[in-house]
């Protein structure tokens, strides 16, 4: 909100109008510098929703209608101007069932989109190798003790988003195929990987 943005970006907090007798707090930046401020917020681990005006000024009483047209998160930042030289900005998802642990990861810069099965004792090393800027986890789940996510932002999603059947539907629709046999993900042992990939795909398509 405006209070948090003003504090994080060191910009002026103002008020304009009232709602239920309480002043409405606002904070703004110059339009030409908006992308730079957006990148700063994302680098701090914040997710930013970009809205555009879609209603006509004076068309009715109350605020002009606006619509969310873009959501930027730590793992979906792609503008090379705001990334370190040669830095690949990855986002990953971790999922597990009773027998298997899986990681799916993607880079919106390069189009990379992969998934693999791993084990509990190797998960920390796999995540460290990927150096993902953002890691998606089901609610109630945590990363292994051996992994210290000093540079990764953890985003928790509803557990149903990691379901294998939902993931398979999303993946086959997106890639235009009847099943996941061609990707080597059609076995029971790959359900955790399909769930991770589906949750990741759904998130980055927002």
Per-range role (PLM):
Residues 1-206:
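Charged catalytic and DNA/RNA-contacting regions of genome-maintenance
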């Amino acid at each position: 909100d405006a209070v948090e943005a003003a504090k994080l970006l060191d910009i002026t907090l103002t008020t304009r109008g009232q709602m239920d007798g309480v002043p409405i707090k606002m904070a703004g930046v110059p339009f030409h510098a908006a992308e730079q401020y957006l990148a700063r917020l994302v680098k701090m681990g914040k997710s930013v929703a970009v809205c555009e005006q879609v209603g006509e000024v004076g068309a009715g009483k109350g605020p002009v209608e606006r619509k969310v047209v873009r959501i930027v998160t730590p793992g979906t930042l792609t503008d090379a101007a705001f990334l370190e030289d040669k830095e690949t900005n990855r986002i990953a998802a971790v999922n597990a069932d009773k027998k298997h642990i899986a990681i799916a990861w993607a880079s919106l810069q390069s189009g990379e989109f992969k998934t693999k099965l791993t084990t509990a004792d190797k998960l920390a090393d796999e995540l460290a190798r990927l150096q993902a800027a953002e890691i998606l986890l089901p609610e109630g789940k945590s990363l292994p003790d051996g992994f210290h996510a000093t540079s990764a932002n953890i985003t928790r999603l509803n557990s149903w988003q990691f379901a294998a059947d939902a993931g398979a539907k999303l993946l086959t629709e997106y890639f235009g195929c009847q099943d996941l046999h061609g990707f080597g993900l059609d076995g029971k042992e790959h359900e955790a990987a399909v769930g991770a990939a589906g949750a990741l795909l759904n998130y980055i398509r927002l």
